[in-house]
């Protein structure tokens, strides 16, 4: 999440305070876990009174909403870069995988895992994560459609399946980045790129012979 993409001098005071609080919330959530982090801890981390904090964010859920909004902006920028890339779509996606997934700082990945865990307990947070997941899958479907139209992906690849598979695969990478102290992005890159190439080549697909979920 790029909290500081706008130069400090250009931000209005309210926006500067909002960024300051969200950065503090990130640190507190990563260090203590979302569930154990209190509003007072975030206020202390931000160096302000609890009253000032509540005036900007009335709850932890509101902070998560702010973080999710920033995440959506970053996602939109990332996909815009991919679609505007002058290289072949496969090469653009390869670079995007390196930049936005494998190079994810561990603390950012841990924040994602904390939010996902809270989504299992908190319906409001769950709704936010579902909205982002749906947006990511929709954008991936468009990207895969573009790859198929250009010949960079197999016409056999179902775009909806491809998007769902890729989201699931990336979530696993984020979990490993968050929890494995010795995670080495460079060592993992050949595997990740190989999976992406296999997906676009149509080598990965649902099992057509799998029984229905309700079958005995």
How should each PLM-predicted stretch be described?
Residues 1-32, 36-45, 61-65:
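Basic, helix-initiating cap at the start of DNA-binding domains
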Residues 126-130, 148-196, 203-216:
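Hydrophobic/aromatic-rich alpha-helical bundle segments in the mid-to-C-terminal region
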Residues 19, 23, 51, 110:
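Short alpha-helical elements of helix-turn-helix
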Residues 66, 77-109, 159-166, 189, ...:
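Hydrophobic alpha-helical connector segments
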Residues 69-74:
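Short, basic, alpha-helical segments at the C-terminal edge of helix-turn-helix-like DNA-binding modules
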Residues 92, 104-127:
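Amphipathic alpha-helical segments used for helix-helix packing
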């Amino acid at each position: 999440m790029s909290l500081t993409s706008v130069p400090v001098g250009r931000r209005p005071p309210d926006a500067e305070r909002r960024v300051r609080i969200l950065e503090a919330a990130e640190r507190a959530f990563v260090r203590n876990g979302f569930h154990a982090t209190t509003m007072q801890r975030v206020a202390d981390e931000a160096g302000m009174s609890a009253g000032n904090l509540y005036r900007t964010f009335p709850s932890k859920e509101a902070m998560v909403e702010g973080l999710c909004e920033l995440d959506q902006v970053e996602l939109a920028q990332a996909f815009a870069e991919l679609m505007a890339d002058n290289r072949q779509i496969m090469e653009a996606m390869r670079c995007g995988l390196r930049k936005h997934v494998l190079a994810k700082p561990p603390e950012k990945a841990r924040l994602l895992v904390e939010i996902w865990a809270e989504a299992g307990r908190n319906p409001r947070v769950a709704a936010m994560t579902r909205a982002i997941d749906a947006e990511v899958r929709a954008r991936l479907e468009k990207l895969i459609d573009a790859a198929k139209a250009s010949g960079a992906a197999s016409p056999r690849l179902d775009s909806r399946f491809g998007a769902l598979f890729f989201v699931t695969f990336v979530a696993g990478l984020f979990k490993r980045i968050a929890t494995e102290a010795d995670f080495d992005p460079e060592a993992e890159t050949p595997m990740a790129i190989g999976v992406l190439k296999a997906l676009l080549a149509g080598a990965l697909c649902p099992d057509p012979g799998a029984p229905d979920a309700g079958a005995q």
